[in-house]
């Protein structure tokens, strides 16, 4: 198992992000484990603390339903009063590729309404070919094209009037890739340059503005097992932070250190595992917090998570998540 948070940047042309104080499926169990154990549904109960004691009542905060392949098909988030705050539905093809995502939100005085929609298609090689979407205000379309060798060629975003809003043009030269981003079309707004090693690991990513000024740069190094052992982040040409990663004999990440430009070294996160590779303890540092946040996991004999005792140091908030399963 390899766990790394706050790691690689992802390409986002149209996304929305929500931060919740809860556990995602990927943090609890892999799709393969859900499929193997034939889990059909998981209900997350939230139990707050009353002084130093866990409130035994609790309330349901998330219900996640799965298909027979272990894919999430529905996630319902609940408010403390039991009403629905949001609903997310997913559809997949026979290769477990996501083909539709719908997000419904509870808007005050409006009730539950569609807030976000994505529909995906794929080409004969399994590459994403198109995305049709609704971002809460208007519709959009994203078209993806590829070179004969399968490498990305272009990504083009169209607005509701079918006008080009944004274009990403890829140039590949050996292990190097250059991405020219035009937004609006005709105006070069950013250039991203990536360098990879022979194993396909990202070594260097540099972002510059259209007029050539360096915006940000990230540099990685790897061990013999192709696991990252360091990451250095630069902004406007200056080193802002470095991270080093430590693994155990099973290639499981056990520690992440933050090294500041003044060479101050801080334990940024740590992980402990049981004999089957299941994570049982996680600690991480929040900026300006006086203590580490943590999660302690209780598992059953099959490695399925029963309970997570969680403390968020930046909020000084402790909570226990308990899980009920339907098979």
Where are these regions (language model features)?
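Buried hydrophobic residues that stabilize the cores of well-folded domains
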Residues: 23-327
